[in-house]
Amino acid sequence: SIRSLPLQPDGEARWRLPAGEYWGQFRIEESLMLRCEAGAVINAEGEGNALTIAAPNVTVQGCTLTNWGSNLTKLNAAVFIQREASHAKVQANRMQGPASGIWVDGTSNVSLLDNVIEGELRLRSQDRGNGIHLYAVHGARVIGNRVRHARDGIYIDTSNGNSLEGNQLEDLRYGIHYMFSNDNRVIGNLTRRTRTGYALMQSRKLTVIGNRSEQDQNYGILMNYITYSTLRDNLVTEVRDGGAGEGMISGSEGKALFIYNSLFNRIEHNRFERSALGIHLTAGSEDNLISDNAFINNRQQVKYVASRRQEWSVAGRGNYWSDYLGWDRNNDGLGEVAYEPNDNVDRLLWRYPQVRLLMNSPGIEVLRWAQRAFPIIKSPGVQDSYPLMQPPAIAPHPQENPS
């Protein structure tokens, strides 16, 4: 029990843990606030959970937690929040260890604020726990945390009505990973050097606004079976080709945005830049509204694999394409000629990459001319009828200069 520690009273139901190293695993079974002094360290001796919260209305603040157990099957964590521990607050703690940093199990209205979580580099990525793991959780606030070298930064499973804001997630498998979770808000987060920045899967009604993905591999934002969701004011830059890797959908070659079997989403005012591929849309992804985005200096702007034509403009406004070669005669900010990023020649290049060696040859130019002159041979693809002549501004990110 937490009562075995030399706690000092700090007010009604408030306790202070003096500086020092304390060995063992501890449970909190009553509503209280635990505040650790600088230099107070709880070392779990490589076993179980460092702290288990098993009562409602508990606050844990300012503690350093280390060396908890590495058994992922037993859900070992630095802080394990049980079902009965609603309204828990875990704030401004530091955690370094092998399994999950904070595991929240089937409770509601928890607040995880400003924690620093560091995984165990000596372990393979798949053998580490997640920085923060929510399972069957409702009403959680996950704000201002920093996670490095865990498996996934924040993993949300079967959890509805939660908010993830202003978290910084670096050197991970997935930065933010959603599975079977609805009505969640993902606002102003930063991922960097992950193998997928935002892995959004099998969920609906996600609000994904003002996030950044920098130097991630494989995917910046991956949407897999996502419906009725909004992506707005996100910046994805420098997504690199890291190979397929573990758990990746085939064909993960540096895609800023990958949309797989996702419908009825609104994707607007985002910027996808300097990546191997700007946007890849496939597998029945239809009825999405895609407008006012900027696709800037991607090696390939669009890959679209489907049998139906898609229009990527809304109410007379399309997207900005840095490789658009049209003109604006009436100065209304819109190109006079539609942007068609993937014609039959592009499809040929996708199927036979070696043909790229002939990209600027007279033969390729003849093929493109024939396609324009005889549109009857034109395959279904993407068309932006109102391409923008200038990239739209996106809202500033709260972590423009993260430390």
Where do the protein language model's features map onto the residues?
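Generic detector of contiguous secondary-structure segments
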Residues: 43-58, 87-112, 210-232, 275-295, ...
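Functionally critical loop-and-helix segments that line ligand-binding/catalytic clefts
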Residues: 114, 235-260, 265-269, 273-403
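Acidic glycine-/aspartate-rich tracts in secreted/extracellular proteins
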Residues: 20-21, 39-40, 324-327
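Short "repeat-start/strand-capping" segments in structured domains, especially the N-termini
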Residues: 29-32, 56-57, 86, 107-110, ...
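Extracellular beta-strand/beta-solenoid scaffold signature
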Residues: 44-52, 72-81, 97-104, 124-135, ...
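Acidic Gly/Asp/Thr-rich repetitive segments characteristic of extracellular carbohydrate-active
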Residues: 1-27
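Extracellular beta-strand-rich solenoid/capping regions of secreted or surface-exposed proteins
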Residues: 22-35, 42-86, 100-107, 134
